Swiss-Prot record:
Subcellular location: Periplasm
Taxonomic classification: Bacteria, Pseudomonadati, Pseudomonadota, Gammaproteobacteria, Alteromonadales
This protein's GO CC annotations: periplasmic space
SUPFAM superfamilies linked to this entry: TolB, N-terminal domain, Tricorn protease N-terminal domain
Record protein name field: Tol-Pal system protein TolB
Role, per record: Part of the Tol-Pal system, which plays a role in outer membrane invagination during cell division and is important for maintaining outer membrane integrity.
Highest taxon in the source lineage: Bacteria
Record family assignment: Belongs to the TolB family.
Coiled coil as UniProt keyword: no
Annotated signal sequence range: 1-21
Keywords recorded for this protein, A-Z: Cell cycle, Cell division, Periplasm, Signal
Gene behind this protein: tolB
Length: 442
């Protein structure tokens, strides 16, 4: 309970604005193929109305995962139940869903609420009903009870979604993560805003506003800091900003290009692109000491570095073969290996957290789309069919990619599952949105 309370406090520190969605989520493909699941509205055991409907958050999360499809509550049997003790397996024999989420909320002191939830195995329940047996304890896949405040309903809903997702898929849920992005609104004097929001667009927070471009936000592995490029001083500079204290540090301000920061897996260094010695090359900067090490040395452009999960290699984009392609450089030996060959261009790559795949922008027949390549088989799959796709960023559980694209003449964010089945757009209410970056687990 103490660990969860500490986690909820950290989340609230980051969520400093009212709970509203700055980015809409418009699902465009993939819901029909998702796995059916039942989510019952949580029983409210108090006067008036609860501060927020937790079940709505859970259902939205599961839909947006691309993996699950919550059934219409109006068609469910036993509407209104809030615990396994009220569950009747015989009533669920004709429901095509693998699990049921039930729960309750009741006041628990001043501005405190006790939230209980249970995950029930419907497949086992249906088997028990067919056999005429009854063993409720075998049906319980998970059960939690937590005291939260009125401001923590949405965050705890994401926590429940994480638990449900992991229990049913074996993959850690990423609903308690955040995204950073740049909003551009040329109707304002300070047209560029660096923003952070929950993964679903709620609880937006502005880190910086500037009349000059902001770009390339990148999260530290602990989720406490953000690196980005700012032109606020009329030149490209790289900053690292603490998201809790708001203190920021200038890491790189050389002449020419200072761009594409990427945190090392241990959070101590940044891989960056600098042109201080002539052509754009890849460097690694120690954040604490500012010590700098040159990694590549080639007459062609080298840019967009990202780290392999083990921290021993970098993936980067280079034109050394004549056109932009992705290369790997071993940080110990300096050996460079070309990684991509299909299509006209391949750029802006990163390695998935499990180290098994590469996500990048592929250009084929003049079209820029997000693609995935299996690093063992080298099989490449184009994931998107949107226009002018760029800046892909992978969720920390490796199941989804957020990226920038163009829709109806405007820059927007979009998301696609790493198997290509689920697709969604994330348009902003005002301005254009670009340069997304998905946080680590928080």
């Amino acid at each position: 309970m103490k660990i969860l309370a500490k986690w909820l406090t950290l989340v609230v520190l980051l969520c400093t604005t009212p709970a509203k969605a700055a980015l809409d989520i418009v699902i465009t493909e993939g819901v029909d193929a998702a796995r059916p699941i039942a989510v019952m509205p949580f029983q409210w055991q108090g006067a008036g109305a609860p501060p927020q409907a937790i079940a709505d958050v859970v259902m939205s999360d599961l839909v947006r995962s691309g993996t699950f499809k919550p059934l219409d509550e109006l068609g469910l049997p036993q509407r209104g139940i809030g615990a396994l003790a009220q569950f009747d397996a015989n009533a669920w024999t004709n429901v095509s869903a693998e699990a049921l989420v039930v729960g309750s909320v009741k006041p628990y002191g001043a501005d405190q609420f006790l939230v209980s939830f249970e995950l029930i195995d419907l497949v086992k329940a249906q088997n028990q009903a067919l056999k005429g047996s009854a063993n409720p304890t075998e049906l319980l896949m998970d059960s939690r009870q937590t005291v939260i405040s009125a401001t923590q309903f949405r965050q705890y809903g994401h926590r429940i979604s994480d638990i449900v997702y992991e229990k049913l898929t074996g993959i850690r849920g990423a609903f308690l993560t955040r995204i950073s992005y740049v909003v551009v609104n040329h109707s304002q004097k300070a047209a560029y805003s660096l923003m952070i929001a929950d993964y679903d667009g709620y609880n937006e927070q502005m880190l910086l506003r500037s009349p000059e471009p902001l770009m390339s936000p990148a999260w530290s592995p602990d989720g406490r800091r953000l690196a980005y490029v700012s032109f606020e001083n009329k030149k490209a500079e790289i900053f690292v900003q603490d998201l809790y204290t708001q203190v920021r540090t200038k890491v790189s301000s050389f002449s020419g290009i200072n761009g594409a920061p990427s945190f090392s897996p241990d959070g101590k260094s940044l891989a960056v692109t600098l042109s201080k010695d002539g052509q754009p090359e890849i460097y690694v900067i120690d954040i604490a000491t500012k010590a700098i090490k040159r990694i590549t040395n080639h007459y062609s452009i080298d840019t967009e570095p990202s780290w392999y999960p083990d921290g021993k290699s970098l993936l980067f984009t280079s034109e050394r073969g004549g056109r932009p392609q992705l290369y790997r450089v071993d940080l110990n030996s300096g050996k460079v290996t070309r990684e991509t060959f299909e299509g006209e261009w391949n750029l802006g790559g990163s390695i998935t957290p499990d180290g098994r795949s590469m996500i990048f922008v592929n250009r084929t027949n003049g079209k820029f789309n997000i693609a995935r390549m299996d690093l063992s088989t080298r099989f490449m799959q184009v994931l998107t069919s949107t226009r002018l796709d760029e800046s892909p960023s992978v969720a920390p559980n490796g199941t989804m990619v957020i990226y920038g694209t163009t829709h109806q003449g405007k820059q927007v964010l979009a998301a696609v599952s790493t198997d290509g089945r689920f697709k969604a757009r994330l348009p902003a209410g005002q301005g254009e949105v670009k340069s997304p970056s998905w946080s680590p687990f928080l």
